[in-house]
Amino acid sequence: LAPTDKSEEEILAWEMEGTRDEEIHRILTVIRPLLAETDSIPIIMGGDFNVHSHLDWTEATRNLYHHGGAVVNWPVSIAMEEAGFKDSFREMNSDPVASPGVTWLADADSLETECRMDRFDFIYYQGKTIQAIASECYDNSLGKTFTFKGEDFFYPSDHGFVLSKFELK
């Protein structure tokens, strides 16, 4: 979790102490040949990235969700964008204040803006033959029952999830 009492520079220095930036660059290097084919074969890449997004830590959210006044260009989401990927949730829900897309809560019983919460789970995509047409985030907590499409499930994660719908052209 970001030390939100710090400046953007201090937060980014803290982030770079970890391995996520190195990991995403390694992944992007490995899939580079596939990225060259996205004009005809789309790519969807999703999961628990366990990192914040620059699309959520904006001027509009700087004083919400314990961002501590910071606007941060998080390196992993920047790397994904620079590699040509689109964030399906943020593309369909462009306002991070109206649609924060919470998938992780420090206090799982609160959705208050004072609560430590963020979106760590993403579905990225790219390609000329694919377009996101809907995307939702579901927040939930480890061990709670979760109802999805009328069915009850034991929820095995401390993160919620993203559900995006795509149209193939």
Model-derived features with residue positions:
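A long, amphipathic alpha-helix that forms part
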Residues: 11-39
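Metal-dependent phosphoester-hydrolase catalytic domains
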Residues: 33-44, 50-169
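A solvent-exposed, charged loop/short amphipathic helix patch at secondary-structure junctions
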Residues: 1-18, 60-68
